[in-house]
Design a protein with these regions (language model features):
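Bacterial Sec-dependent N-terminal signal peptides
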Residues: 1-23
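Beta-propeller folds
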Residues: 19-438
Length: 440
């Protein structure tokens, strides 16, 4: 209700501001998209390149390579109309392998909740032969049904994904062989590698599955929601998406939904050794009713970062765990008088010797720089403004890049701080710069 009221208030204020300007508005102008902010979307830098990026064409039939320098197209990387053994005419999204030699193409995307969806994925190799030609063959990732959250291994030789709440692994070097990593996944009971509804909604993520830096281990969060109360609501045919099964009579949708004071999922972190096929449970020290909103492997394959929150969500702890011994060591704690924002999790970026952390400990959201041992090296930003997104660190000149609202709460600009602490604004035009448009 609060979200609806806020949205309505925003619309009314927006309309009122236009009315005060003397320009009358009509319904057609409001719904036509005339007032939608202008922006660039779908720009994906090509890994290991540094000079080019890619975009889908408007028809979603091609992936085109562009030059950063000129903004002009260089070549078509993929074309559904000409690719060999391609069974689809259009696609929904795509991603690159870390080395930039493969494309993972998503089709038949079906939404589940706010961030989650299933899709049928295909692999397309960008490797060239001695004549500089791509083999132009499309291969299905799996014949077992639609997948969730597929992710490449760092060496690009494997893809892990989730289907029916279980984790699967496809190895390209072994004829795209598929093996099952977990066995106990079950709807409304156990989820492996994907969050339950509460985690997805409150912590804004849809994948709880990571490869180690050396591609030898998989880490994942297991969600046991067997003790979470169920909630049901009627489902109708609707229009987006149109559910044919309920055209004449409504159906029921039942899922696990913990109301205030009810039990949440029991969460645990596990690792899977790809070679030995051994699964281990990590020894994480956390409250019985606490949360694990993120896990992430560092550059060191023997250090798995595990982030925990207490039930009140005002105390964050980060542990480094050894994926084989399962021993975990606390390296950081951050506390808030109110709560820890979920944006904090995604602003933790690991480098070989350091990691970044964004905190409100000073009263404003600012960037801090830590050693991998958990020692605070310095506070990078300071002042009466908020750092919104940490974009990255340049090891060559020890510079930090971030967005902040220093000029206005209504704007977000890109800044750089060099090794001497000098801050430079990099974005010339006023507006809002989304982190996905500049972070690489």
């Amino acid at each position: 209700m609060k979200k609806i009221s806020f949205a309505l208030l925003f619309c009314l204020c927006t309309l009122a501001s236009f009315a005060q300007s003397g320009k009358p508005l009509n319904l057609k102008e409001i719904v036509s998209g005339e007032f939608i902010p202008q922006g660039i979307s779908g720009v994906i830098p090509i890994p290991g390149d540094g000079e080019h990026y890619s975009q889908m064409n408007v028809d979603k039939t091609q992936i085109i390579k562009y030059s950063f320098k000129t903004g002009k197209p260089v070549e078509v990387l993929f074309d559904a109309a000409t690719a060999r053994e391609c069974t689809f005419k259009t696609f929904d999204s795509y991603s690159f392998s870390p080395d930039g030699t493969k494309l993972l193409i998503a089709t038949e995307t079906t939404p589940i909740y706010r961030h989650s969806y299933t899709a049928v994925h295909y692999i397309y190799s960008l490797k060239r032969n001695i004549n500089g030609e791509i083999n132009n063959i499309v291969e299905k990732l799996s014949d077992g049904g639609p997948q969730q959250v597929p992710v490449f291994s760092p060496d690009g030789t494997m893809v892990a994904f989730v289907r029916d709440n279980n984790i699967y692994l496809v190895k390209f070097l072994y004829g795209n062989s598929e093996s099952q990593v977990t066995e106990d996944g079950k709807r409304n009971a156990v989820l492996n590698g994907i969050p339950d509804w509460v985690y997805e909604e409150e912590f804004s993520f849809n994948r709880a599955l990571e490869f180690s830096a050396d591609s030898k281990m998989i880490a994942y969060i297991r969600f046991d929601e067997t003790e979470v109360p169920s909630y049901s609501f009627p489902v109708f045919a609707g229009s987006n998406p149109h559910i044919t099964a309920f055209e004449k009579y409504p159906g029921d949708y039942t899922y696990k939904y913990p109301k205030t004071g009810e039990a949440n999922s029991k969460v645990s972190v596990h690792t899977f050794d790809i070679k030995s096929k051994v699964t281990r449970k990590m020894q994480v020290q956390m409250d019985a009713d606490g949360y694990i909103p993120r896990i992430r492997f560092t550059h060191d394959p023997n250090k798995l970062a595990i982030i925990t929150l207490n039930r009140h969500q005002n105390r964050l702890d980060m542990y480094f765990g050894d994926p084989r011994s399962t021993v975990c060591k606390q390296v950081l704690r951050d506390e808030s008088d109110a709560y820890i924002k979920e944006a904090v999790f995604d602003n933790i970026i690991f480098y070989p010797e350091n990691f970044s952390f964004v905190s409100e400990k000073s009263g404003y959201n600012h960037l801090y720089w830590y050693s991998m041992g958990g020692n605070l090296l310095k506070q990078v930003t300071a002042g009466n403004y908020e750092v919104k997104d940490f974009l990255g660190w340049d090891a060559d000149d020890n510079s930090f890049y971030f967005t902040s609202n220093e000029e206005s709460p209504l704007r977000k600009a890109v800044y750089k701080i060099d090794r001497k602490g000098k801050k430079t604004k990099l974005s010339a035009q006023p507006g809002i710069i989304p982190p996905s448009s500049v972070r690489t």
